[in-house]
């Protein structure tokens, strides 16, 4: 059996790690012993935060909606209840966007929700 020297393979693997570690601080970008665990940890954070991002944005939309419905004499929970009772099925992301970019449209929706609560 012929001998296999691992120079080419090792170089390719290291190059892959260095590419992922680009922009890291200090030895973590140019020493394989420091770069490898740093890249692994970065990937763990990325995986975790892709899940967390969804929660964070939903919380942001809820905060924005709560702030937007207060001038109409509603709280967020009463607003959502009113939407359900009036049969409006628009998600929080779109509602939040409406509240910021189209206040008149959002006001109409808020008034409908308020009317559904009163009825």
Curated annotation (Swiss-Prot):
Pfam families per UniProt: Ribosomal_L20
An annotated GO BP: ribosomal large subunit assembly
Keyword line: Ribonucleoprotein, Ribosomal protein, RNA-binding, rRNA-binding
GO cellular component, one term: ribonucleoprotein complex
Keyword rRNA-binding applies: yes
Record-linked InterPro entries: Ribosomal_bL20, RIBOSOMAL_L20_CS, Ribosomal_protein_bL20_C
GO molecular function, one term: rRNA binding
Residues forming coiled coils: none
Function per UniProt: Binds directly to 23S ribosomal RNA and is necessary for the in vitro assembly process of the 50S ribosomal subunit. It is not involved in the protein synthesizing functions of that subunit.
Family to which this protein belongs: Belongs to the bacterial ribosomal protein bL20 family.
Protein name: Large ribosomal subunit protein bL20
